[in-house]
Amino acid sequence: MVAEVSPKLAASPMKKPFGFRGKMGKWCCCCFPCCRGSGKNNMGAWRDHDDSAFTEPRYHVRREDLGKLHRAAWWGEVPRADLIVMLRGPGINKRDKKKRTALHLACANGNSEVVSLLLDRQCQLHVFDSKKRTALIKAVQCQEDECALMLLQHGTDPNLPDMYGNTALHYAVYNEDKLMAKTLLLYGADIESKNKGGLTPLLLAVHGQKQRMVKFLIKKKANLNALDRFGRTALILAVRCGSASIVSLLLQQNIDVFSQDVFGQTAEDYAVSSHHSIICQLLSDYKENQMPNNSSGNSNPEQDLKLTSEEEPQRLKGSENSQHEKVTQEPDINKDCDREVEEEMQKHGSNNVGLSENLTDGAAAGNGDGGLVPQRKSRKHENQQFPNTEIEEYHRPEKKSNEKNKVKSQIHSVDNLDDITWPSEIASEDYDLLFSNYETFTLLIEQLKMDFNDSASLSKIQDAVISEEHLLELKNSHYEQLTVEVEQMENMVHVLQK
């Protein structure tokens, strides 16, 4: 004769088998390709970090080991009125043989009604079970999002680690529960917390080849250069696991490809030793694209200076062509100045030094007019060539040396015109070269003035762009928070409709 079995008791273990349920089917020791031994180096890669913390997330429960309140929290068999009576006693935070409270059991099994009653009675939130896990960690580990949200809303700390160093965020990332991970971050979860293997949530996602979570954490500004206990970056872990898609994703973030682990190996070294040809090609292409930037950063300053000096005449020539219309529309004083220079050259064909002194003196005196043209002290009509005070200088040979020193000191005081030099042998140069230097001097000052105005405008534009970007970031953050709240409300409505 077959013994009768209570249908209620028989259904419970079948409904939620320990360690496995419909949505928890991925909790097994072969959840990663590297655990299944695909690839030459993958098995060793996963053995670097213990996977036991993530296996069998649900509690093993025997009915005879639980008290009345713990049974009600786990199975939810007790009517609400009786449960309220139980919660009036002093044993609301009582633990069973494995240090589990009623809150642990209710969260692990998704009994949100019991969790709500326990929270209303102000039960302790930060009690640890035998594996130093809080009720929040159990709720996240078992993917009971509604219970986890209630705990967070009542002030549960999301950064308390278990005996493996994993926080609630580590388990959300392992479960690929993007909504739960986003909720934890909104409630202050540390995105850079490390477990005992030195894995941050991002490194854990890379190690598990969870590309969706890797993208999410990169978007949340996770540190791409974080190191595990072996000094390995996210890129090295992705290479060791043979995930070309994650390697490509990380390379798009301009990650350091030359970082070495404690064994002195780089990502490329592991790719070569594991014969991952696709990854080798990705790394090679990335380094080739980065090479121009590195070579320009390590170039010789003397060579750069030489190239600049060689390119200066071409730059000035191009500037002269591009600004031809502007130069032709200058005020009449510029035309007078050019006419005066030509006439002076004809009158004083034998005195090079005097003309050079007048030109430089006039250029130095032009600071008040933006540095474009020399200033004149007196002008009676257009055909007047130079002021009387300047013409008299040509009849005073004993003052030439003093005037030369004055001109040199004025030239050296112009900080932005270092490219224009006046040699001491200028007295022996011909008038054509001197006149060419004068035109170059005038064009360069005009170019510098225009560059200064462009820089001011550019600065204003950049400030406006930065302000808009900051405003956009604030709007995106607010939108994400509203999205999470809407999804949570939809989940709660769905639960209430059942």
Curated annotation (Swiss-Prot):
Residues 303-338, 392-406 have a biased composition (Basic and acidic residues). ANK repeats lie at residues 98-127, 131-160, 164-193, 197-226, 230-259. The keyword Coiled coil applies. Residues 290-302, 348-359 have a biased composition (Polar residues). Keywords: ANK repeat, Coiled coil, Repeat. Gene3D superfamilies: Ankyrin repeat-containing domain. Belongs to the POTE family. The lineage of its organism: Eukaryota, Metazoa, Chordata, Craniata, Vertebrata. PROSITE patterns: ANK_REP_REGION, ANK_REPEAT. The gene is POTEA. This is POTE ankyrin domain family member A. Residues 469-497 form a coiled coil. Residues 289-410 are annotated as: Disordered. It comes from the Eukaryota.
